[in-house]
Amino acid sequence: LVDKKLVDEYNLDILSDAIDSERDLQFTYLGLQTLYDRYFIQSEDTKIELPQAFFMRVAMGLANNEENKEEKAIEFYRLLSSFDFMSSTPTLFNSATLRPQLSSCYLSTIPDDLRGIFDGITDDAMLSKFAGGLGNDWSRVRSMGTHIKGTNGKSQGIVPFLKVANDTAVAVNQGGKRKGAMCAYLETWHLDIEEFLDLRKNTGDDRRRTHDMNTANWIPDLFMKRVVEEKSWTLFS
């Protein structure tokens, strides 16, 4: 659960002496309940952390690469336990654990080939597993009806793949502690842009809807100039 190598590198007596249990009194009931429900390390169904030990564990992970580990860990601990500074949720979840993934968000571009698309979805699943939020640019993926050279067939466009990505984020939640978070991005010139804008609707074919995924349409200055000038806008794949 906790990185034993990291623990062995610290003088735990020094860190224990720095813990101030009186700081537990700064919590509201709701804050303490949230900490207990979502953030404490647990073994099976048993929580094995207390609030100040939790903050020290996070601080130890953050100070791991510092020259004077104990001094920096205590400095980080005091910042966290006083609420003067608070790390992001993945850092609080994972610092000093066997999977020290500390970043909140990961951005990627999905390539225009089948293997690359599913490699991207697999990467999303693994990142979500360890509490990472996800943002994928789908602009490179060809649109519906586009020729596929390898099979001499026609592409189904981005929407079916977005449905798979949406369901992956639902299936692989963030460390079992909160729902997966994913956002799909598409540029305004893409031929599938109109269907993309319908993804969150509650009507229509549910197989072409992504109710759990956020969507974002990248709009360049040129598009807005065309709108102001009442000119045409070209879509392509």
Protein language model features and the residues they cover:
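Extended catalytic cores of very large enzyme megasubunits
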Residues: 1-237
